[in-house]
Amino acid sequence: MINGAFRRRSMAWLAAAALGLGGLGLGDTGTVLGATTPPATLADAWLDLERRQPGAIEWQHAFALRDTTAESVPSLRRRLMGDLHTLAVSARVAGNAPRQRSLEAWRAHLGEWQDRHIRTPQRLDLPWLAANLRHNPPLERIVHFGVCEAPNWVEVWSLDGVTRLDWVPDMSLEHLRDSLSASAARQSDTAAIITPLGEVHRRGIAAWNHQPTSLAPGSRVLLELPSRQGLRGALPFPGVGDEEDLINRRLPELLATRVPGERCRVWGNDEGHNDEGHNDEGHEVKE
């Protein structure tokens, strides 16, 4: 979980960024977003935005979308929806109606997503780029970048469906697990945690592999499908257990591509042009 120390350190990183980027000929972009001298890299664009925006930027809720991610995410989502359909049909044939309903709820939730509300699941904020200048991408390879307001929820994908819990200070996996139905909590041994930074961490949640873990606001948590238990042999379709393993791997990867909040300001790589035209304030997206 990221706290105030991150924000304090970011100010030092910003100063380092200005020096480091300037040393590489990248720090002076003249005028900013929408100006006649466009930023050449993502770090340049962040510096422009940082100078323009009132108040501090919450870098732990900043994001960017590479063109390669924008091309791959729609097909990943379609494949995952197909896998969920296979499992839901198998659960129905096996007479497992609760499991069928849960998987159909997951699939329906994915079907409601808009592919433009995505990010590349890695840190591309200014503090990180300042410390990793060799990984500073050219702006022409960035579809958009932006910052979200810190949300007040944690999203949970479990056999109860897809739910959002109000985030509270010191919220942990234990708190989250206690909020689930007994059957949903009992059937999962492992959870995949997707942080607001787009990182995926796996933690044990059963008695035998329990790992204490705190949750940041805006985290998404998948209680993984129980592929190691008796279900694989009970399902009527050969190879269905493979779909479970794929979902346990692919769904966290897909969740990591979601923007880290609901109220976000997004800027395109055309220096402030967006769907509504030229606007240094960017445009707002909502899930």
Question: Can you say where each PLM-predicted feature lies in the sequence?
Answer:
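Ser/Thr/Pro/Gly-biased, low-complexity, turn-/loop-rich segments
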Residues: I2-R7, G27-D275, D280-E287
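Bacterial N-terminal signal peptides
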Residues: A12-G25
